[in-house]
């Protein structure tokens, strides 16, 4: 059993310019389930750690600084997935990304139930810091087709943001 239906996991290293917006976009999500945010800070030195601490008053936020300094994005992601407070669905958000609206997390979790799947990959829009669209624009993962098969992730590097997984599969 999971205490949280979903956990948004943000691995971060030296992203003081973007981490606040990423965190705000998660904490403003409107969902009909309990969720939390796990930020794994890989020993940032640019003020990122202090920026994350600004949100310490929100008990949905778990701020982790791993013992090791060499984890990288994958090691930080794994630390989040294996944290005891990680929810039933682990949703990765990059530290320089924001959700497009307050219902994004709800849509991701709904997709798990509607499609009876273990992984959800969504569409995203490339923008500058003023949220103006820049090339290549909308990334829609049209390469994920029935013709390409369910194991297309093994053939292409198409696991773009947003991406989410059924946590028990990741922990197996």
Residue spans for each PLM region:
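Cell-envelope/extracellular polymer assembly enzymes that use nucleotide-activated donors
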Residues: 5-7, 36
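Short, acidic, metal-binding catalytic loop of nucleotide-sugar glycosyltransferases
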Residues: 24-34
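Conserved short acidic donor-positioning loop in nucleotide-sugar-dependent glycosyltransferases
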Residues: 26, 42-43, 71, 95-96
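A conserved acidic beta->alpha catalytic loop
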Residues: 41-50, 69
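Glycine-rich, basic loop-to-helix element that forms the pyrophosphate-binding segment
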Residues: 67-85
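Short beta-strand-to-loop acidic/aromatic patch adjacent to the donor-nucleotide binding site
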Residues: 87-98
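Conserved donor NDP-sugar-binding/catalytic core segment of glycosyltransferases
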Residues: 103-136
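Short, flexible, basic/aromatic active-site loop/helix in glycosyltransferases
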Residues: 123, 136-156, 160
């Amino acid at each position: 059993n999971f205490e949280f239906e979903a956990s948004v996991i943000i691995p971060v290293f030296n992203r003081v310019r973007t981490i606040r917006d990423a965190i705000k976009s998660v904490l403003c999500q409107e969902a009909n389930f309990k969720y939390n945010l796990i930020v794994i800070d890989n020993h940032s030195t640019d003020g990122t750690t202090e920026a994350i601490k600004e949100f310490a008053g929100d008990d949905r936020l778990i701020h982790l600084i791993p013992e090791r300094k060499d984890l990288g994005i994958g090691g930080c992601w794994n630390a989040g997935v294996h944290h005891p407070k990680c929810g039933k669905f682990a949703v990765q958000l990059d530290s320089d990304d924001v959700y497009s609206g307050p219902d994004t997390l709800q849509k991701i979790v709904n997709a798990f139930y509607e499609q009876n799947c273990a992984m959800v990959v969504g569409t995203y829009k490339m923008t500058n810091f003023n949220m103006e669209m820049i090339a290549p624009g909308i990334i829609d993962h049209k390469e994920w087709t029935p013709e390409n098969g369910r194991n297309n992730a093994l053939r292409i590097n198409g696991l773009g943001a947003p991406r989410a997984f059924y946590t028990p599969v990741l922990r197996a």
